[in-house]
């Protein structure tokens, strides 16, 4: 099993396969046009950023099955408050900030609901619904399962920078914390994920020895 995580991504766009700068310029333009009442621009804005929002909330909530509902909630919130968006940050950074709040609110609602059975525990749900064989991981190791082992703040920082390709500055704005805090959380997340991969490899070798 390959126990090496993807190389860290910093603030340089060259480290990200997609041209994030160009994409952000276009999507931000659509958001501003939508704010002015352009319905076609609003549709284009949603289509352009839907995938990033779904990926973000799926990893952050550790519940892939809830991702579409959380993404829909995010876009509804964004469209209701679009008149406040002035383009000082990219539309994607602004939208992911809203997505984070949607996930946090969902956690709070879930915590307020009484558990009806042991199967309501989110970890059990994660175990049943984990995707396997995700790109970048061999032998069926699921990234979602690994991320579920991380504390919320480290998982958030890792997803924003390493999976969605945000710079540390953009991730800090989305997470509402200093850049240095994001860097520290990403470093600790990578250390923890590497340890989990190595532990899994050791257990596999022990079973087959």
Show where each model-derived region lies.
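A short pre-motif secondary-structure segment
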Residues: 157-161
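Short, charged helix-capping/linker segments at alpha-helix termini
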Residues: 35-44, 54-73
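Intrinsic, short, N-terminal disordered tails of RNA polymerase sigma-factor systems
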Residues: 1-32, 36, 40, 44, ...
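Arg/Lys-rich amphipathic alpha helix in sigma70-family domain 2
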Residues: 80-87, 97-118, 136, 188
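Residue-level preference for hydrophobic side chains embedded in well-ordered alpha helices
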Residues: 45, 49, 53, 57, ...
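Residues within helix-turn-helix
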Residues: 65, 169, 180
